[in-house]
Amino acid sequence: MPRKHLIASGINKKQQTQAKLGNKLAKEIKAAAKVGGPNPEANPRLKAAIDKALQNNLSKESIEKNINGSIKDPSSLTDAEYEGYGPNGLRIIIKTLSDNDNRTISSLRGYFSKLKGEIAKPNSVKNSFIYGGEIIISNKDLTEDDLMEKILLSLEKIEVTDNDEPIQETNQHEDCFQIIVMPKYFYKIRQELETLGLKIIESEIKYIPTDYVDLNKEDYARLERFLDSCNEDDDVQWVISNFGEVIE
């Protein structure tokens, strides 16, 4: 998997203000706790939401407040994933959490129209992504052989179901290693790798592109405006695409 995936995955974060991101993270925690209960060990969605919140510096106090607040919250939110196409066949997945689906879909249609794209049928875009746990590790003072040795050691420490392949992919980049794991082993493998002294830069269970689309400057500018609109929309939780790089 090329390095440009790691660059593209950062676009959304750079454009999102910390306050806006914090609100979206808190909203997901509250919704996850309300649907699946307040215990993250028994609620995978809540566990993932807390993990992402901590990585983005949301305080433990705020996390607890939102978990506890979910019990008394009378609002009813519906979560959905929308798929769409952008310029040059760009593929996009959008996660929403909304109390008004009609408002949400109307807004998304407007964003896609300005992008010169369109909303797609369900599951027509997701075949360009895999859903897995991505672990990004610093390669400072770490060779590929060292990494593979530590991965094998970590696998010895966890219980693996027959026929499962916990490690889906490993890739070496200029300044980091990328490991993609099966979601159900994500937390255990990450914990073991941390215990073995590896420096984890970033980690998340997410959709990861399997192929990429490059855009010219004009189309890339449209994509940036599209992301700005999505990031400012309180109904939109996240956006991911298979954007590769800008071409002249």
UniProtKB/Swiss-Prot annotation:
Keyword terms, alphabetized: Cytoplasm, DNA-binding, Transcription, Transcription regulation
Gene Ontology biological-process entries: regulation of DNA-templated transcription
Annotated GO MF terms: DNA binding
SUPFAM superfamilies registered for this protein in UniProt: YebC-like
Localisation per UniProt entry: Cytoplasm
Domain of life: Bacteria
An annotated GO cellular component: cytosol
InterPro entries: Integrase-like_N (IPR017856), TACO1_YebC-like_2nd/3rd_dom (IPR048300), TACO1_YebC_N (IPR049083), Transcrip_reg_TACO1-like (IPR002876), Transcrip_reg_TACO1-like_dom3 (IPR026564), YebC-like (IPR029072)
Family, similarity comment: Belongs to the TACO1 family.
Name this polypeptide is given: Probable transcriptional regulatory protein MYPE8020
Species, as recorded: Malacoplasma penetrans (strain HF-2)
Lineage per the UniProt record: Bacteria, Bacillati, Mycoplasmatota, Mycoplasmoidales, Mycoplasmoidaceae
